Every structure is written in structure tokens, then in C-alpha cells.
Amino acid sequence: MSIIYESEVPNPNTLFVRDPNPQICEWQGRKALQLSGQGASLLIVPDLHLAQGWIEVDMGADGAAYPGIAFRIMDSLNYELAYIQPHTSGQWDALQYDPVFHGSNTWQLYYGVGAQQHVEVPPKTWLHLRIEFQDQRALIQVGTQEPLLVNQLAHHHNSGLVGLWTFLPAYFSNLRFGDDAPDFLASMPLAGNENSLAVTVTEWFMEGFGVIQTEENGILNLNRYLPLSETEVRLVREVEVPTGGKFTFNVGFSDQLTLQIDDEVVFKGENLYQNSPKWEERGYVKPDQQIECFLHKGIHRLTAILKAKENFGFGLALNIEGDGYRLLPAHLCR
């Protein structure tokens, strides 16, 4: 095993640190680095880029927190991220893959198989997190528990820096990483996205920008294209109907949506995070809102007006059910 960086307690004075008050302290019988997690703390080891390899660290928290590992860091606003959640220990999201785009977390867009894993991660305990990655796949594991297998890492850049991350206070020790080719790939199945949604609209024309595409899971990730300062967009697509009939639009979104057909509002709704143990109240983007409309023969213009209210994922998923319709090319929308 080739180790290219190792530190019992990472020294914040020699690293890039986005944290107002990093501290070296004692926690659970061990010397540790404490990050405050105010506004999401990020520590980056400079000058060491990894395209493939492994990263491991011990971490823990006294209560609610999201301590994790950032990798393939392109800059302080764009990177791959995986973390544990001691306050949801044993639940479906106790281990979460959550790529960061333009400074926004996106876990409401990346969930389920390939993004979340049941693990036991109790508070007030040292826990070992390890990530192995190569190409667009990664294995993320807490101790010897069942690993999370990510078949499609979200970012397109294939190399970057390594760091630590947390929202809310957490403790870290024994950070090390290397660039050995991981051996998990031989036993990891090459599969499509098992969490892919049944969507029919995979391209949109975003006004003021151009044509954009959905992710592998069928969800449109607006954070990929927009900075946090852009909180409202208009998405357009045209559909041709050969004969009149009833159509069903199944839509999922985050955070607020107004859907128009030929400039007539057919749906308005809000889907926000709620601090709840219920899956359906977390604000995940899933096309489970149904709108039924009668469309006459001809070309109809769909307009989705989306507004962001949180930094957990800004996105849309749309599936159209009906006979004989045809989506016109997105680049023809103006």
C-alpha cells in the first residue's frame, strides 16, 4: 500500500481551511482536530492530486453532524463528497454520497441505491470512514459494515485534491491516503443506475443559458450549471401531439415549481426539507406529483419555472404519459 499523505492530527496551519475556529483538542481519549461546521467546514490538503486511490480517516461527533471526506476537489465549491450522519444512525441515509456543485449540496437529487446506505454510526464514538475510487466508481465504507457502491460519480473531472468536510461540529484524526489502484472494482458489478427514474424529458432549454441534460438517474441537476446566486430559472420544451387526448405529467422538483402548458398554469407546488424521520418529508426529487391535462392536436409549449429556497439540491424530473406524442428538439426552443 503506497501512502502519499499521513497525519495523526491534521495541522490546520499547513492546510487550506474554511472554518472560523479549527482547534486541536482531546476527544474520546484521543488527540483530534475539531472543525466547527459553521457554514460547512472544508479542509484541503494542498498540492496532492488523486485521480484514483484510497482515503481513510477516523471521525466522530457529539450529536447531529455530517463529518466526511471530500475528494476530487476541483476548487472549494466543486467536489465529490461522502459523509456519515450520527444523528440518523441505522437509517437509510446514515451514510450519504452528496456531490457538491457550485457550493451547493445535492443530496435531494442523489439518493437511494448508489447514494445512501444503512450503517450504524452512533455519536460519541470514533468511526473509521474509507473511500476507494477509480474512473467513475467508488466504494465508501464505515469500518467493516456493508459498503456503499457508487457506480457513477457525478462530477466530470477525473482528478482533484483531498480534504475533510463537516456541517456542524465534528472531530477527525488519522487522515491518510494513497494512489494505489483500488481492488474493489473487480468484484463490483458494472451496472446501469439502479436508482434511475422513469422520466421521458431528459433535455430542457434553459432560458439565458441553452440546452441542459438530466443526470444518469433522470433528474435535472441545476446546481451543475448555476451558481448559488441564481435562484430562479425558466425551462422550456415543446411537445407535438398528433391527435387530441388526455396526458399525465408526473413531476418531481426542488424547491418550488410553477408548471405551464401554453402559458396556462397547470401546477404550483413546494417541496422543501423537513426535519423529519419520514422519507417522504426530506424533499427528495421524485416524479410522484400527477397533473392530468387534455391536449389538442398540435404543438404545445411546456414551461417549468423553478425557484431555489435551500442548498440541498435544485432540480426537476418529468415523465409524460400519453399516446403518440413527440418531444421536439430542445435546441429549437427559444
Where in the sequence are the language-model features?
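Short, aromatic/His-centered strand-loop micro-motif at the edge of beta-sheets
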Residues: 104-128, 291-292
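Beta-strand-rich ligand-recognition modules
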Residues: 258-303, 307-317
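Aromatic-lined ligand-binding clefts that engage carbohydrates, nucleic acids, or primary amines
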Residues: 246-259, 302
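Short, solvent-exposed beta-strand-to-loop segments that form ligand-recognition rims
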Residues: 141-161, 266-278
